[in-house]
Design a protein with these regions (language model features):
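N-terminal accessory targeting/assembly segments
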Residues: 1-107
Length: 107
C-alpha cells in the first residue's frame, strides 16, 4: 500500500461536543477534551475533518445535540466526506442509534 493509499484509508471523523448546564463538569465537552479526543482519533489512525460544539440547557433526549445541530453535523459530514462522527459525551444506546441513522454514518 502506498503512502497516499494509506492516507485515504484513514477514517475521516467529525468531532461533536455538548456543553450543557445540566451536565457535570466531567460530562461536558470543552476545548481541552475535544483536543484530547482529536489526539485519540489520530492515534487510532483517524483524522479529524471538522468540529462542532453545541451549548444547551440540557441534552436532547432523542438526539443528544438537538435536531438543528444534528442537521448541521449532517451537512458538515457530507461536505467533508466524513465516514464517522465521534461524540465527546456519553450517549445512550438509543441516542447513538438515532444519530447514526440521521447522520448516515457510524457514531
Amino acid at each position: 500500500m502506498t503512502e497516499n493509499e494509506t492516507k485515504q484509508a484513514k477514517n475521516r471523523a467529525v468531532l461533536v461536543g455538548l456543553n450543557a448546564h445540566s451536565l457535570s463538569a466531567e460530562e461536558n465537552a470543552d476545548d481541552t477534551s475535544m483536543e484530547e479526543l482529536a489526539d485519540l482519533l489520530e492515534t487510532a489512525g483517524g483524522v479529524c475533518v471538522g468540529t462542532v460544539f453545541q451549548n444547551k440547557d440540557a441534552p436532547d433526549p432523542r438526539t443528544f445535540i438537538g435536531e438543528g445541530k444534528a442537521a448541521e453535523v449532517k451537512e458538515l459530514v457530507g461536505a467533508m466526506g466524513a465516514d464517522m462522527v465521534v461524540v465527546d459525551n456519553p450517549l445512550s444506546p438509543s441516542q447513538q442509534r438515532v444519530l447514526s441513522e440521521e447522520l448516515g454514518v457510524q457514531v
